[in-house]
Design a protein with these regions (language model features):
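Anionic-ligand-binding alpha/beta catalytic cores of soluble enzymes and soluble regulatory domains
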Residues: 116-188, 192-194
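Pepsin/retropepsin-fold aspartyl endopeptidases
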Residues: 243, 253-264
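Alpha-helical scaffold segments in soluble metabolic enzymes
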Residues: 13-17, 45-48, 94, 130-134
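A conserved acidic, glycine/proline-rich C-terminal tail/linker
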Residues: 181-249
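N-terminal glycine-rich anion-binding loop in soluble enzyme alpha/beta folds
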Residues: 1-33
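Active-site histidine-anchored catalytic micro-motif
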Residues: 9, 21-27, 38-44, 53-62, ...
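A residue-level signal for conserved active-site and pocket-lining positions in enzyme catalytic cores
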Residues: 3, 131, 240
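Short acidic, Gly/Ser-rich segments with clustered Asp/Glu that frequently serve as metal-coordination loops
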Residues: 4-8, 66-69, 244-247
């Protein structure tokens, strides 16, 4: 997973490095479309995807605005037995919050890096990809380098439930469809008292929007807005067969407020 995009050769080069070290490894792409430099967006992607992979899986993740600085390159082993090769910039925060931290080590062993001069701007090629490939090839995690006693953490915003309703955050777009993904768990939303088919008013970035709570997109006419619980069990906002983000000019980060059923919308 990276923020490299696919319009240049960076991803192909990283994969070539991996294959040259671990030719039998199965390399799968999570995404290379993380918004450039948005560490939290990348972290949320890792959080969302990693539960579907088995113990022993090696994830290489590069969203690294601090490349070439004093920030550490690390390998994290979770208590679930998965490995994450990435910069120590908080990219791993939501994963270890959920799965627990077994150990973290700084990548200092030169034999785990590309055997050439290390670029100051392409650690994805020179450090993260070869380190991940060595792990996938069965090299001992303990040989990566010294233990990192404390990791850099992201300060993640979380939804808050009160007697008035839920205040949450728009944390991502479901591209290419442009749906707004929030951090409000489906179970928390359901405690507000709404039933499928209910139509009500919410606030997105403090602007009122009237929309129905439905199960899926075709439960409303084409072009209408809707609120639904997505496949990750998060409240999401969409337009049936259109791009909500482009239609209404809303992008993350942002805020959302949903009042309890029967309660007045929050004062402006």
């Amino acid at each position: 997973m990276t923020d490299f995009g696919t319009a240049n050769d960076a991803v192909a080069i990283c994969k070539a490095v991996m294959i040259s070290i671990a030719p039998d490894a199965r390399i799968m792409d999570i995404t290379h479309g993380v918004t450039p430099f948005r560490i939290e967006e990348g972290a949320r992607n890792l959080e969302s995807v990693s539960p579907y992979y088995p113990a022993g899986t090696v994830f290489v993740a590069v969203v690294d605005p601090g490349v070439g600085t004093s920030r550490k390159a690390i390998v994290v082993k979770t208590k679930k037995g998965q490995y994450f090769v990435l910069p120590d910039n908080g990219l791993i925060t939501p994963v270890i919050d959920r799965d627990g931290l077994d150990s973290a080590r700084e990548i200092t062993n030169q034999s785990w890096m590309i055997q050439a001069a290390i670029s100051s701007t392409f650690h994805g090629r020179d450090i993260f990809s070869p380190a991940g490939a060595h792990l996938a090839a069965g090299w001992d995690f303990n040989l990566v380098g010294p233990v990192v006693p404390q990791l850099v953490r992201l300060t993640l915003k979380t939804s808050t439930t009160t007697d008035k309703g839920i205040e949450g955050n728009i944390i991502a777009l479901d591209d290419p469809f442009g749906s707004l993904v929030t951090d409000i768990p489906g179970d928390e939303f359901k405690k507000l008292g709404y039933s499928l088919g209910d139509k009500f008013r919410i606030e997105i970035n403090k602007k009122s929007v009237v929309l129905p709570y439905v199960k899926t997109f075709m439960d409303v006419p084409v072009g209408d807005v809707l609120l639904f619980i997505d496949s990750r069990d998060r409240v999401s906002i969409a337009v049936n067969q259109a791009n909500y983000s482009k239609k209404f000019g809303v992008e993350p980060p942002g805020t959302i407020f949903i009042s309890r059923k029967g309660a007045p919308i929050k004062d402006k």
